Amino acid sequence: METLFRLPFAVLECPNIKLKRPGWVHMPSAMTVYALVVVSYFLITGGIIYDVIVEPPSVGSMTDEHGHQRPVAFLAYRVNGQYIMEGLASSFLFTMGGLGFIILDRSNAPNIPKLNRFLLLFIGFVSVLLSFFMARVFMRMKLPGYLMG
């Protein structure tokens, strides 16, 4: 294998180039990187790739017993399909739960006053629990009868 990789370099000669970093390029701050990670997590869990490829409608419609069309946000009985609003709502909940865990982690810093620590713990627990139970509600709307019993 080594010979196979050495073969092109026996024929070609590498140029003597000295590259240096441009002056305007600098290391991003930790908060900028964190914001990019959270935004990309939001978009990926929201199914942005699926939305670009399949181009589903933002919301669907369903005919009720009187023959009227009413909007629905969840594509029921289809695990591998979604409306755009369904993906964004689920993505918001996943992101809120993840941020709740990060808030819970930040509440353990040693220099935080007691009231702020309590508020961080409360907000963290509420966001984690709310996102968990709302995700269960979304699953019940997506697959009726799935989480029963």
From Swiss-Prot:
Protein location: Membrane
Keyword Transmembrane on entry: yes
Any matching Pfam family: OST3_OST6
Stretches of the chain found on the membrane's Cytoplasmic side: 1-32, 105-117
InterPro entries: OligosaccharylTrfase_OST3/OST6, OSTC
GO annotation, cellular component aspect: oligosaccharyltransferase complex
Keywords linked to the UniProt accession: Membrane, Transmembrane, Transmembrane helix
Recorded topology in the membrane: Multi-pass membrane protein
Gene Ontology biological-process entries: protein glycosylation
Pathway: Protein modification; protein glycosylation
TM helices/strands, residue ranges: 33-53, 84-104, 118-138
Major location category of this protein: membrane
Topology Extracellular: residue spans: 54-83, 139-149
Entry similarity comment: Belongs to the OSTC family.
Subunit structure: Specific component of the STT3A-containing form of the oligosaccharyltransferase (OST) complex.
Role noted for this protein: Specific component of the STT3A-containing form of the oligosaccharyl transferase (OST) complex that catalyzes the initial transfer of a defined glycan (Glc(3)Man(9)GlcNAc(2) in eukaryotes) from the lipid carrier dolichol-pyrophosphate to an asparagine residue within an Asn-X-Ser/Thr consensus motif in nascent polypeptide chains, the first step in protein N-glycosylation. N-glycosylation occurs cotranslationally and the complex associates with the Sec61 complex at the channel-forming translocon complex that mediates protein translocation across the endoplasmic reticulum (ER).
Protein name in UniProt: Oligosaccharyltransferase complex subunit OSTC
Lineage, broadest ranks: Eukaryota, Metazoa, Chordata, Craniata, Vertebrata
Gene from which this protein is expressed: OSTC
